[in-house]
Amino acid sequence: IGRRLTPYLSINSGVRLESVTVDNPRLDTSTELNNSLGTSNLYIGNVGIVRDTRDSVVQATTGSLFSMNYSQAFGDYSYSRGDLDLKTYRLLYQRPDGSGRHTVSFGTKLGFTGNSTPIFENYFAGGFSTLRGFDFRGASPLQGGVRVGGEFQWLNTVEYMFPLTASDNVKGVLFCDYGTVEEDIEITADNFRVAPGFGFRLSMPGAGIGAPLAFDFAFPVASAAGDDEKIFSFYLGVLR
């Protein structure tokens, strides 16, 4: 449920009811995974506030998007969770007709969750919308060879987007993703990841695809022991 307070500001709330079953683990070497085995019932209520001044939800060039959410879980697990998400966009240059825009953007995600959070609700990183250069959830804490995620995340990206064609249907990007997911609320140098890279954005409005296709190549220069790296990623959407 949401309500718009001003043209740029809105509030929202919701309830999530889930029954989650975890069984037959490939490895039984993780205490956190073993503690989550069986069927669990979760009842999660959340409230949030969003301020959105972007000029576009697909490929923004000016403005910002800020969201803050708080969740409280009940049922078989009881814990609190808080998330902050900020994205800002700055237009560097455009042609006189408004096309050919060069944009720099910055994004950061900060999240905390309680120590009673089950493994399937922990934070994980790795993949297009978190840390490129790593496999899906491949930049997350390990326990006994099992990806258990963590109670804290701080993920960031800096990106420069520029046109490669006069029609703006093909754009290039240079970026650097960096940050960490930790089992506890802390930042340790050994777990900090950094992955610069480049990519392309392909828009096909004639094919009825509103969101651009994203093709990215990232090369981790800092990673944690046990991380799964993956240079190429593909995505269709507007998460970045």
Regions found by a protein language model. Give the residues of each.
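C-terminal beta-signal and terminal closure region of outer-membrane beta-barrel proteins
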Residues: 187-240
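C-terminal outer-membrane beta-barrel translocator/porin domains of Gram-negative envelope proteins
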Residues: 16-19, 26-170, 174-191, 223-226, ...
